[in-house]
Amino acid sequence: MRFYSILSAVATLLLSSLPLHAADWLALPEQAPAPADNPTTAEKVELGKALFFDPRFSSTGTVSCNSCHNVMLGGEDNRPVSMGIHGKTGGRNSPTVWNSGFSASQFWDGRSPSLEDQAKGPVANLVEMGMADVETAMDRVRSIPGYKPLFEAAFGKDSMTVDNAARAVAAFERTLVTPNSPYDRYVKGEKTALNQQQIRGMNTFASVGCTSCHSGAAFNGPQMPEGNGFFMKFPTFADNAYVKKYDLLADRGRADVTGKEADAYFFKVPTLRNIALTAPYFHNGRVDTLDEAVKVMAKTQLNIELDKAQTEDMVAFLKALTGEFPEITMPRLPATEGWHIETE
């Protein structure tokens, strides 16, 4: 994989020599794009929100989508790795659900091409929600009378299917957008939205090469067609103390999905939006603080060491990516009638 190391180093040198232009910095749109076969409607969002918050579709009745992707927080659970049924823990850090509609693929390894596909995964995961399969989970949905009118309002008659449930959850997730951060206001022309330290951090972010991966409005790479995620090798430069300290070579990333050795240690480039709220960091959740994460990235991805001032400036800039969160209220879930959850 020496080719990728050389490519990254060349990209860094090229980027550091380029002037910064206002056109290189993009504000986050107010709405996430929706696919043609699943346009966002208020009815889908209402249904999807209920499904997202409902723990009854886990085998124990205790774990919902919101358990690991808490929209009352930064869209994750602030754990190194998420906790599922019976206190089981997974192997990766929970990505934020906020602004996930701007990602061309889902999961750290990009194994799902869309939010609709991703929504079907956790319910049948033995660690996360623990149902035997997605149809068993859907049978739970069908057994709750109050869900039928919600499905009919969103999709019409005889519409209580796995695919429609996934479409509804995805529609709700696409409303989870946090625009109008200080950074967004700055690039739109409000030049007092960032202070001088944040502006220095913004310039350092670009000049040292961070934008070779974290570009675009969501800071997760170039805009890609849905299903074609943007992946980078992590760590690119593995011969440093951080790699051992934080066990960064234990997870082979996308190679576990494709079976290709060339994909070893490649991961989806995550958004940096609201990153100050989503600790701990990286796919294994081993790094606790944002300043340490910045140092790790500089060394493992760019093979440079930032000084104290550069690190502090960049952290200040990254904190300026925290946007405005829409008000989220807990939904009133349809009542369970005539049955109870059989726990294992």
Language-model region placement:
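Short glycine/threonine-rich turn/loop motifs
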Residues: 23-121, 184-295, 329-344
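A gly/proline- and charged-residue-enriched helix-loop-helix capping module
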Residues: 126-131, 140
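Sec/Tat signal peptide C-region and signal peptidase I cleavage site
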Residues: 18-22
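Bacterial N-terminal signal peptides that target proteins for export
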Residues: 1-8
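Generic hydrophobic/packing signal
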Residues: 11, 101-104, 119-123, 145, ...
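Short His/Asp/Glu-rich catalytic/ion-coordination signatures at enzyme active sites or charged loops
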Residues: 129, 147, 175-178, 182, ...
